[in-house]
Amino acid sequence: SLELPGSELVRDAGCVFVALNYRLGLFGWNCLPALTADPDATGNFALLDIARALDWVRDNIRRFGGDADNITLCGFSDGGRMAAALAGSPLFRGRFQKAVAISGGLSLADPDAAAQKLAENFAPLAVEDGRFADTASAAEWLLTPGSDVREWLCGLEPARIAALGKPATLYADDVVLSRDARSAVPLLL
């Protein structure tokens, strides 16, 4: 990334640098009930992407001269927020040994408030599709755990979702992120 100079870290610190990609915005964080109704479900999709990427790093880093028992997760801004949050996530135990959070905080949204905001963000699309006459009714529907909501959400064109341009945020779901988690690895802020 531009904020983390990977080539300089490799040159000056002698480390192996791996940049991870994950879903962004409304594609990465969506806690509408239709997507999270199962007790083991989470709408923290971006974090699940990071979990899989870290599994790949752990399984393959030796091929690049790295040490699978010495992985440091580092992030800047939102990435720093995620690094700090993941340091306390039980799902991430053993996936990395240290974390660095640069210019990030550790605020987690309340899932109910986040779902309400997401429903308001998606409601105009349901109106455009002719499902409802007004956004209030559409938002109310979007807050239900029905399979019809899930099917509609999963059938939306990605460009329409991206065009919403609305921010999404980390939220405590007690699946990936716990409300009261404490860092299980050394964390440099």
Locate the predicted segments by residue.
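Substrate-access "cap/lid" subdomains that shape
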Residues: 59, 93, 102-189
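Short glycine-enriched nucleophile-adjacent loop
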Residues: 80-92
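Short, solvent-exposed loop/turn and secondary-structure capping segments
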Residues: 1-3, 28-32, 84-86, 109-115
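Active-site loop->helix "elbow" adjoining a glycine-rich segment at hydrolase catalytic centers
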Residues: 45-49, 77-82
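Loop/turn elements at helix/coil->beta-strand transitions in domains of secreted/extracellular proteins
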Residues: 13-18, 67-71, 94-98, 183-186
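Cap/lid segment of the alpha/beta-hydrolase catalytic domain
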Residues: 1-51, 59-63
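Catalytic nucleophile serine of serine hydrolases
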Residues: 75-78, 90, 103
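Alpha/beta-hydrolase fold nucleophile elbow
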Residues: 57, 64-76
